[in-house]
A protein has these predicted regions:
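Conserved alpha/beta catalytic core and glycan-binding cleft of carbohydrate-active enzymes
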Residues: 232, 236-238, 259, 282-409
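A cross-domain feature marking catalytic cores of carbohydrate-active enzymes
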Residues: 146, 180, 223-229, 267-269, ...
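Aromatic-lined carbohydrate-binding/catalytic grooves of carbohydrate-active enzymes
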Residues: 149-152, 165-209, 219, 230-238, ...
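Short loop/turn motifs at secondary-structure junctions
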Residues: 172-173, 251, 256-261, 352, ...
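Hydrophobic faces of well-ordered beta-strands that scaffold small-molecule active sites
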Residues: 140-142, 176-178, 221-223, 263-265, ...
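Short, acidic/polar
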Residues: 154-168, 241-256, 364-372
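Carbohydrate-interacting/catalytic domains
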Residues: 1-177, 183, 208-214, 275-284, ...
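Active-site neighborhood of glycoside hydrolase catalytic domains
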Residues: 244-304
Length: 548
């Protein structure tokens, strides 16, 4: 017989077979129990080693195309099988229902959020539209009538004023009312040139430089063009008014081209046909820019004359002596303010005690802080003269004409008079004292320029005691402010009545104290209105939040 052909090679060496044992065979006897156990243990150990070698041998073989393809085919087959299983599971009824349920929940949740947003928008109170405001609506104006007195004794010019702009910036004023600074021969129309700066005060180049520097600090410059400011009649004689008016109109064009932001005319009560001239000059400034301001000043406190002047022009600021009444009681000041607001109607007001003078000329020293708080929180533009922020007093020696007081920057500014002046009255000393009049002025000016309720908020007077004047300033959903002023010489409980408030406004039980005119009171504290008591001559600025 032919021999059987050998088995084909698989590419892996076969393990050689062991020769049969000498004891194998049908006739062989089984060994003893002990010998059998030892032999089996050895055989098992040998077999395990052979198995490990067989498992390690393929790992030692080099990879070739055939083996790589085989592995890839196996992997692909496994992945295809897993994918088919996932497709079958995803297409099952349970998963289809689950996906539809989740999709439905998503859209229901989205529609619910949309409906909630619509309800919130519809039910939320609408914000009031902000009124159109110009720069003079947003803060105080600062008058520098005598440039030399403002800077020092008989030494001051436009270049020196430029060096004081940093100080003016700390006061947060929005504009300075400068001058008059033009050439004026006393009571001489021909010798008056409204377009020429007095040589002692500087040149046109100095003025242009001042304008540019002031604008960089967001301070506007208003120029006083009162023609005959050195003479007896500020507007010359009535039969010269035509010539004067022509000079004024030419000067308006000249200075507007130079970049001046506004103009002031004082003592308009002495100007023949003042209403018609003011209206014409206002039109001239508005034709150039709506952002130009016109200020008129009068010493009159007659409401009929004041209303006539205000009705003649649009956006006219009028300074007067209306509030300079010798009666300093809360009820009387409340009456004056109420009458003025009722007379002016919706027109924008300005608040001062005169067209040129200092607060100390009209208000007792103990009420200076109170009047600062009053002027800064009434609805309108507060107008101050230089020195009002430090309580500057006009020193007039007996028998001498009234002169503009020298600004007290430091001890070196003290006037050469026999009257003693305290060093605490200077700008230098008060700048270092957080409880000073100057510090109070700066804080009030800062609040006035950034709080909407104080900028253009509604004004509501509260009923209170005879020596008290109290009111609320509020705008839409912004923080509200409560002002309580005690003009009396003794401490008094507030006892605020709210019957005059609109139904949408009410006073809370507790309010926050922003500031007091008396340095001793603890600020930033919560105050219970029912037990609120004011010290003599004390004013409080309190605030409380809007509640829907």
């Amino acid at each position: 017989m032919d021999p059987e052909p050998p088995e084909p090679s698989t590419g892996v060496d076969s393990v050689p077979r062991q020769p049969p044992s000498a004891h194998s065979g049908p006739d062989a006897q089984a060994p003893s129990a002990g010998g059998a156990s030892g032999t089996m243990s050895q055989d098992t150990e040998v077999d395990m080693k052979e198995v490990e070698l067989n498992e390690m041998e393929p790992e030692k073989q080099p990879m070739n195309a055939a083996s790589g393809a085989a592995v890839a085919v196996v992997a692909a087959g496994g992945a295809e099988k897993n994918g088919l299983v996932k497709i079958k599971v995803a297409g099952s009824r349970g998963w289809v229902r689950t996906r539809w349920a989740l999709l439905l929940l998503f859209w229901l949740g989205w529609l619910g959020m949309l409906a909630g947003a619509v309800v919130i928008i519809v039910r939320a109170p609408r914000c009031r539209e902000l009124p159109a405001q110009s720069w003079w609506h947003k803060g105080a104006l600062y008058r520098i009538g005598d440039l030399q007195a403002f800077q020092g004794r008989d030494a001051g010019d436009l270049a020196g004023l430029k060096g004081r702009l940093d100080y003016l910036s700390t006061l947060k004023v929005k504009g300075i009312v400068l001058g008059p600074i033009h050439e004026n021969q006393e009571d001489d129309v021909a010798g008056t040139n409204l377009e020429q700066i007095h040589p002692a005060l500087g040149s046109k180049e100095d003025f242009d430089s001042l304008l540019q520097s002031a604008k960089k600090k967001s301070i506007r410059v208003i120029l006083d063009l009162t023609p005959n400011y050195r003479g007896q009649n500020p507007w010359f004689l009535p039969d010269e008014i035509t010539t004067v008016a022509t000079k004024v109109e030419d000067a308006l064009k000249f200075w507007m081209q130079a970049g001046v932001d506004g103009f002031q005319f004082r003592d308009v009560g002495n100007l023949t046909n003042a209403s018609s001239f003011l209206a014409k000059w206002q039109d001239m400034t508005k034709n150039i820019s709506e952002d130009r301001l016109l200020i008129a000043g009068t010493e009159s406190s007659d409401l009929h004359q004041i209303r006539s002047l205000l009705e003649s022009t649009k956006d006219l600021l009028l300074t007067s002596s209306y509030l300079s009444n010798p009666s300093f009681t809360g009820k009387h000041v409340e009456f004056l303010v109420t009458q003025y607001l009722n007379t002016t109607g919706s027109r924008w007001c300005s608040w001062s005690l005169s067209q040129t003078g200092l607060l100390t000329s009209f208000v007792p020293a103990q009420l200076l802080r109170l009047y600062q708080l009053l002027l800064f929180t009434l609805p309108g533009t507060p107008v101050f003269s230089y020195g009002d922020e430090i309580g500057l007093e006009a020193a007039v020696p007996p028998g001498q004409p009234l002169k503009a007081p020298v600004m007290l920057w430091d001890e070196s500014s003290f006037p050469n008079t026999s009257r003693s002046v305290s060093s605490s009255k200077t700008v230098k000393a008060q700048s270092q004292d957080p409880g000073s009049l100057l510090s109070l002025f700066r804080r009030l000016s800062d609040q006035r320029s950034k709080e909407r309720s104080l900028l253009h908020g509604d004004f509501h007077i509260l009923s209170s005691g005879p020596d008290l004047f109290s009111y609320v300033r509020q705008w839409d959903q912004n923080e509200r402010f409560l002002v309580v002023l005690n003009f009396g010489n003794v401490g008094q409980p507030a006892k605020l009545g709210t019957s005059s408030l609109p139904t949408s406004t009410s006073l809370p039980a507790r309010v926050d104290l922003m500031l007091s005119t008396q340095p001793g009171r603890k600020e930033s504290a919560s105050v219970e209105l029912e037990h609120l008591t004011l010290e003599p001559h004390e004013g409080l600025l309190l605030r409380f939040p809007y509640v829907a």
